[in-house]
């Protein structure tokens, strides 16, 4: 079973995310790409639509998209962040995310997932796992934007305001933001990002190709019973990350 190195664990602890190259085997990648082709053919985006377009699918019946997590090293790599805890797919859901050019958008800020209008409790989770399904090796080609280190800033925010502030802010906590980064990579690369890492959709105007990615919301088993505590302690569910950071400071 593959696991993150101590350096990668520390990078996740400080930046809130890691990018790992060539994780998904070619056969699994091809099968998932064909399934996305089928989705787009059966349920095409509206004519002349640009920007983001999502498909939300159940993971309960398996299939080539779910297999990107269950049948590849992605599962064990995510697991290694929270060891000895157990990782699972949250909400039994996988997201196919397209970003269709020409989309002249430039992200003005971040958000956190999980806010649901009218719901008192947010749909939080432990981490986001993204599988890049297309070339995203230049900026402004539909890349995901992230704000490094904001998992820590958000935890400090919720310590002060209380975990209910996630709902009160409607998923847009007002925190001081560093300079953003765009996620770069190619098919088969993966992103593992802390739930509280600020992120957003970017533009797709430097490329003529549709950006494709598949996302899983992952949670440590039992997360739904401790989500409030997790918002106030960014390492509560990340035992392996906490241990790696502690070793660095000795």
Language-model features: locations:
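Short, structured patches in soluble enzyme cores that scaffold and shape functional sites
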Residues: 112-114, 131-135, 146-148
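Short, conserved beta-strand element in jelly-roll/cupin
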Residues: 118-139, 184-187, 217-220
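Short, surface-exposed loop/helix-turn segments at secondary-structure junctions
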Residues: 106-114, 163-177, 208-210, 229-232
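Non-heme Fe(II)/2-oxoglutarate
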Residues: 42, 50, 190-192, 196-250
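Non-heme Fe(II)-dependent double-stranded beta-helix
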Residues: 1-14, 21-119
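Short, solvent-exposed loop/turn segments at secondary-structure junctions
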Residues: 25-26, 96, 136-138, 151-152, ...
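Short edge-strand/loop segments of extracellular domains
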Residues: 99, 147-153, 211, 217-222
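Double-stranded beta-helix
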Residues: 137-198
């Amino acid at each position: 079973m593959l696991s993150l190195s101590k350096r990668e664990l520390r990078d996740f602890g400080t930046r809130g995310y890691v990018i790992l190259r060539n994780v998904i085997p070619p056969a699994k990648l091809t099968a998932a790409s064909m399934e996305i082709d089928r989705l787009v053919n059966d349920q095409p985006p509206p004519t002349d639509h640009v920007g983001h377009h999502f498909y939300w699918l159940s993971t309960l019946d398996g299939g080539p998209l779910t297999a990107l997590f269950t049948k590849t090293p992605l599962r064990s790599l995510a697991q290694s962040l929270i060891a000895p805890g157990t990782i699972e797919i949250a909400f039994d859901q996988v997201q196919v995310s397209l970003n269709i050019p020409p989309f002249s958008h430039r992200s003005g800020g971040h958000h956190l997932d999980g806010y649901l209008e009218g719901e008192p409790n947010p749909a939080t989770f432990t981490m986001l796992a993204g599988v890049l399904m297309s070339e995203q090796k230049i900026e402004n080609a539909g890349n995901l934007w992230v704000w490094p280190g904001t998992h820590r800033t958000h935890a400090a925010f919720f310590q002060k305001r209380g975990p209910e502030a996630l709902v009160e802010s409607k998923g847009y906590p007002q925190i001081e933001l560093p300079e953003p980064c765009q996620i770069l990579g190619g098919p088969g690369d993966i992103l593992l990002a802390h739930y509280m890492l600020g992120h957003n959709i970017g533009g797709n105007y430097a490329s003529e190709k549709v950006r494709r990615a598949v996302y899983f919301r992952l949670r440590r088993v039992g997360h739904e019973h401790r989500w409030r505590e997790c918002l106030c302690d960014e390492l509560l569910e990340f035992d392996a990350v906490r241990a790696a950071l502690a070793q660095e400071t000795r």
